[in-house]
From Swiss-Prot:
HAMAP family tied to this protein: Ribosomal_bL17
One Gene Ontology cellular component: cytosolic large ribosomal subunit
Protein name stated in the entry: Large ribosomal subunit protein bL17
Subunit organization: Part of the 50S ribosomal subunit. Contacts protein L32.
Transmembrane segments: none
Gene Ontology MF term list: structural constituent of ribosome
The family this protein is said to belong to: Belongs to the bacterial ribosomal protein bL17 family.
Keywords recorded for this protein, A-Z: Ribonucleoprotein, Ribosomal protein
Pfam families tied to this protein: Ribosomal_L17
SUPFAM superfamilies assigned: Prokaryotic ribosomal protein L17 (SSF64263)
Gene3D superfamilies the UniProt entry points to: Ribosomal protein L17
InterPro entries for the chain: Ribosomal_bL17, Ribosomal_bL17_CS, Ribosomal_bL17_sf
């Protein structure tokens, strides 16, 4: 029986799951939006939300904990220098999950995971900047 067991197994062993969410958390911090399956997206929330909460208070101990959970200095830098200050006033709920249909190969439900309050650059502005250069 699986009574009181939290978290999804996702047909992986524990080390594979841990490595996958470490990579996904790093990608989400770097790109601020990623596309994945809906169950992975829901489980990723449990990984990334505590990281951002930790990044609100910049200390050596917190940076070391964040590095242990992401394994990437660039990600830790962005967490503490950009995301921590950005979400200083927000008491949780830093991510948004948007369903986006089903994958063509296996009909798996797909979703975008994005950070809320992220600066969105319009496609038209990018095109104008590219033509000016």
């Amino acid at each position: 029986m699986r009574h009181r067991k939290s978290g999804r197994q996702l047909n992986r062993n524990s080390s594979h799951r841990q490595a996958m969410f470490k990579n996904m958390a790093g990608s989400l911090v770097k790109h601020e939006v990623i596309k994945t399956t809906l169950p992975k997206a829901k489980e990723l929330r449990r990984v990334i939300e505590p990281l951002i909460t930790m990044a609100k208070e910049d200390s050596v101990a917190n940076r070391r904990l964040a590095f242990a959970r992401t394994g990437d200095k660039e990600v830790v830098g962005k967490l503490f220098n950009e995301l921590g200050p950005r979400y200083e006033a927000r008491p949780g709920g830093y991510t948004r999950i948007l369903k986006c249909g089903f994958r063509a190969g296996d009909n798996a439900p797909m979703a975008y995971v994005e950070l809320v309050d992220r600066p969105v650059v319009e496609a038209e502005e990018e095109a104008v900047e590219a033509t000016e250069e």
